[in-house]
């Protein structure tokens, strides 16, 4: 996801990840490849007003690994939204951050209770990518 927030939410959260600014850029370690699909999200929920659901449906994707900077905000809301849309979200517990550790712990406990599973990065297994045409 590419995070790009609007100015009208800064009264609550302060200025952060402004669309087009340096802090909204995707880091080099996660460089976008030609075959990648980038979803630009403007809210806590990566499904809200984006093409994410349609893209996942079109590619037959049901299982989602969810990670990110704020476990108790974007990660939890995106995972919850995925669950409501009949996807199977799994939060990667050591690939999420938070400002307060107690908020991170709450988010992980809540995700585990809601979705039945959180997972450590070392336990993530990926299926081989399909062969290119």
Question: Could you say what each language-model-derived stretch is?
Answer:
Residues 3, 7-133:
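Active-site-adjacent betaalpha module
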């Amino acid at each position: 996801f590419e995070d790009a927030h609007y100015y009208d939410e800064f009264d609550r959260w302060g200025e952060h990840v402004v669309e087009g600014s340096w802090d909204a850029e995707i880091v080099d370690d996660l460089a976008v490849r030609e075959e990648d699909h980038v979803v630009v999200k403007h809210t806590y929920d990566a499904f809200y007003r984006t093409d994410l659901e349609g893209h996942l449906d079109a590619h037959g994707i049901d299982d989602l690994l969810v990670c990110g900077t704020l476990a108790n905000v974007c990660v939890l809301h995106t995972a919850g939204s995925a669950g409501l849309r009949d996807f199977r979200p799994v939060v990667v517990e050591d690939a999420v951050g938070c400002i307060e550790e107690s908020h991170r712990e709450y988010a992980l406990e809540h995700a585990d209770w809601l979705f039945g599973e959180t997972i450590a990065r070392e336990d993530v297994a990926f299926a081989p990518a399909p062969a290119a045409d």
